[in-house]
């Protein structure tokens, strides 16, 4: 069981154990490792062939920044008194205070839910995540945008999940401009943000247009990935 997003951990475990089948269950899956049996990979919120709109409104970086353990990342284990103790890369997660606060708030929220239909759980989760991730308020950006995030395996080079970008840097993220930059037609530098929607709202300029363009670019990327999956 893992948050996601490409299934390589499951593939590695299967190869290490030399088992023919190991099933993995994920919050979401953008893609599946090549030559792997897709029936072993189970995505809850979306998978490579399902949930295109949900992917377009989703920020996996924000998800990881919020739904993470308060301890530092485990990088190994050592044996102490016949027990294996995890070794972390830092004393604690730099986001620990807000993570602990969110855990307490989440406990209160869960206890207040009287009736929960597990069959409608995807829709329920979408109603919570979509407005926050794809069209956040300034208050939500102030609350979550300063969480530190790193896409490095060892969690180095921590940055705000909603990077503080200039108007020009936001414009370079728009669908047509970014596509032209990516294929080399325009010579511009792209300044990435782990949560681009948060950066757009934080800047506060041409918000609606930039948010629409961000969704359009994400949808284009995931349609392309879906085509690639089907033509393997």
For each feature predicted by the language model, list its residue ranges:
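Long, low-complexity, Lys/Arg-enriched
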Residues: 1-232
């Amino acid at each position: 069981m893992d948050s996601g997003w490409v299934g390589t951990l499951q593939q590695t475990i299967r190869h290490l154990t030399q088992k023919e089948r190991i099933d993995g269950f994920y919050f979401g899956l953008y893609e599946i490792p090549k030559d792997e049996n897709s029936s072993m990979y189970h995505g809850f919120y979306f998978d490579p062939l399902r949930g295109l709109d949900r992917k377009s409104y989703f920020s996996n970086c924000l998800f990881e920044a919020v739904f993470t353990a308060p301890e530092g990342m485990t990088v190994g284990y050592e044996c102490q008194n016949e027990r294996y103790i995890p070794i972390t890369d830092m004393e604690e997660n730099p986001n620990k205070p807000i993570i602990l606060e969110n855990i307490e708030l989440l406990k209160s929220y869960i206890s207040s839910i009287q009736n929960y239909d597990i069959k409608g759980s995807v829709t329920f989760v979408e109603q919570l995540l979509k407005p926050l991730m794809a069209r956040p308020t300034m208050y939500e950006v102030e609350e979550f945008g300063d969480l530190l995030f790193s896409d490095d395996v060892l969690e180095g080079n921590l940055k705000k999940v909603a990077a503080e970008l200039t108007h020009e840097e936001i414009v370079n993220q728009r669908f047509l401009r970014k596509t032209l930059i990516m294929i080399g037609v325009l010579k511009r530098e792209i300044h990435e943000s782990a949560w681009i929607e948060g950066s757009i709202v934080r800047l506060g300029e041409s918000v609606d247009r930039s948010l629409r363009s961000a969704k359009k670019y994400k949808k284009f990327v995931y349609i392309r990935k879906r085509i690639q999956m089907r033509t393997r």
